[in-house]
Amino acid sequence: MPPEQPELSVVIVTGDPGTRRGLEKTLSSLLHQRSVEKIEIVVVDCASADAPPLSGSDHPRVRTVKLPRSGTTMAQARAEGVRQARAPIVGFLDEHSFAMAGWAEALIKAHQGPWAGVGGEIYNGTSARGFSDPIYLMGHSRWMPPAPRGEAELLPSHDTCYKREVILQYGDQLPELLMAEPVLMRRLRLDGHRLYVDPDVKSIHGYTVNPLTLVAFYAWSRCFAASRARSLGWSLGKRLLFGLSSPLIPLVRAARLFQYLLLRRPVCLPTFLIGLPIILLAQAGAAVGEGLGMIFGLGGAEVLFTQTHLRGLRLRAEYP
């Protein structure tokens, strides 16, 4: 363990051996940061006891925390990573996110401000592969380069860094809030905290689109809806209203994305129009998840989402 106090902790969660290749590249992107001596990397390992260690985890800036394979969800693993972290700010990256040059330095600098959470620009690491470009627009269009610098209502999930003491105040609620980070961000803002986009914080995100990807969209969206309703104290009537309105989600979100691109990113409109069928299909999976999550709660969605990330359920593209 490094003797000096780190300025930034980065939590990455790893699962079964077949899912580790992308995370090894994620870890490498952190170990090649200019400010690596200021970083602590917390690898939360949720694989079986006989699984080989993540390549690169023997680096002096890396600390491994073992959790049981059985019964540990992605959100629980991330929350434990936050608790184990030693730096005042803690960020997350997953197996399809990679830090670009200067990422850590920019986060440390930005967090000198009054921000509870800081996010940055997201680049598409699988551009022109299959339907990755329309999915990129759907998920990260507002953080595409050049991302506007300034206070924000929402930051990119899985690529955001928080002040540790702020999110630890949520105690036993933290795992639930980390199931779907937009819920955590909404809760932070309701509690008077502020979020910030710094375009100097640059990361690459990979996108895979295949039938199993729809499973991940469904599972994450059900987690989002259930966590949103429960954490924000929604009444049964409000949950039913949102749940019964969920079939409108694909059209409403596609229309909002079209309007945003028309006004802010018109160069992306051809990609949107070509990819509209896959966007609607992905949002249909999300609509099913949100509708069920609002009305019936979490169900097995958190376990299913964990399987897509840690147990090899979702097929992954090869990233550069």
Where does each model-flagged region fall?
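Short, acidic, metal-binding catalytic loop of nucleotide-sugar glycosyltransferases
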Residues: 28-38
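Active-site-adjacent helix/loop segment of glycosyltransferases
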Residues: 195, 202-282
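A recurrent flexible, glycine/aromatic-enriched loop bordering the glycosyltransferase active site
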Residues: 124, 143-162, 176-177, 203
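Conserved donor NDP-sugar-binding/catalytic core segment of glycosyltransferases
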Residues: 102-131
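Glycine-rich, basic loop-to-helix element that forms the pyrophosphate-binding segment
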Residues: 68-85
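Acidic donor-binding loop at a coil-to-helix junction in glycosyltransferase catalytic cores
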Residues: 177-186
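N-proximal low-complexity "stem/linker" segments adjacent to membrane-targeting elements
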Residues: 1-29
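Short aromatic/hydrophobic "clamp" motif used to bind/position activated sugar donors
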Residues: 90
